Curated annotation (Swiss-Prot):
Keywords: Ribonucleoprotein, Ribosomal protein. One of its GO terms (biological process) is translation. This is Large ribosomal subunit protein bL32. It comes from Bordetella pertussis (strain Tohama I / ATCC BAA-589 / NCTC 13251). The gene is rpmF. It holds the Pfam family Ribosomal_L32p.
């Protein structure tokens, strides 16, 4: 079993945990529809970067 050699100071402990926080996912607004969607993903209406790339049931 591993045993620490020296006690980690509160400062070093905080630096070790600095990447453990949660981040909200990056979202974008589709210019045509005004909908919010994840960055680099198709919007629910089938638009990506202002262009229609996927047919939806509403189109048919």
């Amino acid at each position: 079993m591993a045993v620490q050699q020296n006690k980690k100071s509160p400062s070093k402990r905080g630096m070790h945990r600095s990447h453990d926080f949660l981040v909200n996912p990056a979202t974008a607004i589709e210019p045509n529809t005004g909908e919010t969607h994840l960055r680099h993903h198709i919007s629910p209406n089938g638009f990506y970067r202002g262009r229609k790339v996927l047919k939806t049931k509403a189109d048919e």
